[in-house]
Amino acid sequence: QVDCSLAPASGGTCQPDVATLWHALRGENYELDVDIDKMMEAAAVFKDCMSDYFIPPEAKAVEPMIPWSPMPGGALTANTQMMRDNNLMDKYEECISAMSEVVKRGGFATSVTPVSQFYFQQAFNNVIFGPWEKFAEGYGKMVLGYFGKTPVEPDSEIIELASKKMNLQPTKENPVDLND
């Protein structure tokens, strides 16, 4: 089974376009079981419906670094909109590249909201202020244990830096007890 999407929502933060995959797989051992003419018709209607909406270019472009970041589509467009609003889109590629280290050294927590935001905010801080000079509040509290345990223990150097820069001690307490 292969997941596909319709242009103009396919690509960057979504699955590949159904027509592109259909064409690429024609004549191979695997074919998409779709009526391509109906799909193209639906794509034209969808494209017309979406013409009233702003779709950021990075949401439509394939970015090969995304699987290593990892940055889910909703977080990507929210964060790039913030960068666009502040004239910082020139830092986009650096931030996406910086995320891999942030995820790895932060304990590999699941990259969904709010953790995907923590990752991006920390990667952004690392790019703008220098590596590990300023900790994003959510990321720092996560590596210090305030939201529970990450799948892998965060890097001890990052725990130490976050504790020092945020003036917070690491904790192993139950997050429910901490936030009661």
Can you say where each PLM-predicted feature lies in the sequence?
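Glycine-rich beta-alpha junction loops
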Residues: 8, 43-46, 103-106
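Generic alpha-helix signal with a bias toward terminal, lower-confidence helices
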Residues: 11-14, 46, 58, 155, ...
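Terminal or standalone catalytic/regulatory effector modules within metabolic enzymes
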Residues: 60-65, 70-180
